[in-house]
């Protein structure tokens, strides 16, 4: 009796969703609900000090500039057949390691002000008496743990920030709204252009955070409409920040330049607090968690870059050494905050323009990937017969 053999057809493999490094939705959430958190500490008072009622103008220019940078990187990602980081490695080869080294140093440099701001914020918000020398040291334990995690962990944190950020933001804005006077923002363009330019320059370290999205975009398996989602997320975060700045100045007016750590103060003027107590602190706690995630983000990138350069998987050791060094730095240099801030936001401002605005745009000049001439490996031979029952690859017929 003739025996007929059926050859199975091999299905084309597809990337599993659960194995993706990060999704466009998570990057959009990071842009909308994670990046704005750090702008609620010192940025409002700095903009108010230099630009007065026109504090929104330099902020808008910052957001437009960062949006152009993000659009450039997204366009490069859309033209790449693989995640942008793989394309960069294939083009640059070993030359990619100096790029990693430069950005590891930049992310470490850009984390200095957020670290010092976070320390002062914690002391001002949560300590009624003078804190001990190591009170802020707990943060570095948290940071050392977070820095050992990969891109997936950042995506999960972004998902959490949807609730940790948006609900407290709306609640605190509502508490302050009854005491605001938006006429304090008038007249529009009433500040001299030189002062607005000064506000733009001094606030550059606080608004040059679009670069924090670039490692996420570089690891994204780009699909259609991913760019629109990410840009929409960044735009939504920008609108929330602009609204907060308007509420802040409408609340404090000419005194806004002296009011530091804005989001812990705007809720204090809610009339019902005398009856229900300081419920505004509950929302401040939630925003503080988002602030911790944000502060850890550049340190996490630095850890990943150092491990890549050294070709080691000992992230725990690298993270521990990095955070120990930062703890020592904060302990010894926090008393020189004003000097460090004036240096970074003054003479060292071009560092942010170079690494956050100029270098990322260079990905537009990456050569395109050549088209593969190889035939698909998973294509079944023409003579293969499809079995009647799926998975039935046994012999047909009896003996």
Q: What feature does the model see in each segment?
A:
Residues 40-132:
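Membrane helical hairpin/interfacial module
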Residues 310-317, 331-352:
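Extracellular/periplasmic helix-loop-helix junctions in multi-pass membrane proteins
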Residues 21-43, 58, 62, 66-69, ...:
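Hydrophobic, membrane-embedded alpha-helices of multi-pass small-molecule transporters
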Residues 49, 81, 120-123, 141-161, ...:
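Membrane-water interface regions at transmembrane-helix termini and the short interhelical loops
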């Amino acid at each position: 009796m003739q025996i007929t053999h059926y050859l199975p057809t091999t299905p084309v493999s597809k990337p599993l969703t659960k194995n993706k490094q990060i999704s466009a939705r998570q990057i959009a959430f990071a842009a909308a609900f994670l990046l704005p958190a750090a702008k609620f500490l010192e940025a409002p008072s700095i903009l108010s000090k230099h630009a007065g009622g026109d504090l929104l103008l330099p902020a808008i220019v910052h957001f437009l500039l960062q949006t152009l940078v993000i659009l450039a990187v997204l366009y490069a990602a859309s033209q790449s057949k693989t995640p942008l980081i793989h394309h960069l490695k294939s083009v640059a080869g070993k030359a990619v390691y100096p790029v990693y080294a430069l950005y590891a140093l930049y992310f470490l440099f850009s984390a200095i002000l957020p670290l010092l701001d976070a320390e002062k914020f914690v002391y001002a918000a949560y300590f009624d008496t003078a804190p001990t020398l190591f009170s802020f040291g707990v943060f570095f334990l948290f940071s050392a743990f977070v820095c050992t995690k990969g891109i997936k962990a950042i995506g999960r944190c972004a998902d959490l920030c949807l609730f940790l950020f948006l609900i407290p933001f709306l609640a605190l804005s509502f508490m302050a709204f009854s005491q605001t006077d938006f006429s304090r923002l008038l007249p529009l363009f009433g500040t001299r252009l030189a002062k607005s330019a000064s506000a733009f320059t001094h606030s550059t370290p606080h608004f040059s955070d679009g670069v924090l999205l670039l490692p996420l975009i570089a690891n994204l398996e780009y699909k259609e409409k991913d760019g629109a989602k990410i840009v929409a997320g960044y735009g939504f975060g920008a609108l929330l920040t602009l609204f907060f700045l308007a509420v802040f100045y409408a609340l404090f007016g000419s005194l806004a330049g002296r009011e530091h750590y804005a989001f812990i103060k705007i809720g204090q003027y809610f009339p019902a607090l005398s009856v229900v107590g300081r419920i505004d602190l509950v929302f401040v706690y939630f925003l503080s968690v988002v602030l911790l995630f944000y502060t850890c983000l550049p340190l996490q990138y630095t850890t990943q870059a150092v491990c890549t350069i050294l070709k080691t998987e000992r992230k725990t050791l690298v993270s521990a050494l990095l955070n120990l060094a930062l703890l020592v730095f904060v302990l010894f240099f926090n008393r020189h905050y004003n000097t460090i801030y004036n240096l970074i936001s003054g003479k060292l401002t071009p560092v942010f323009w170079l690494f956050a605005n100029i270098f990322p745009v260079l990905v537009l000049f990456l050569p395109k990937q050549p088209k593969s001439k190889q035939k698909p490996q998973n294509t079944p031979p023409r003579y293969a017969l499809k079995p009647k029952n799926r998975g039935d690859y046994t012999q047909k017929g009896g003996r």
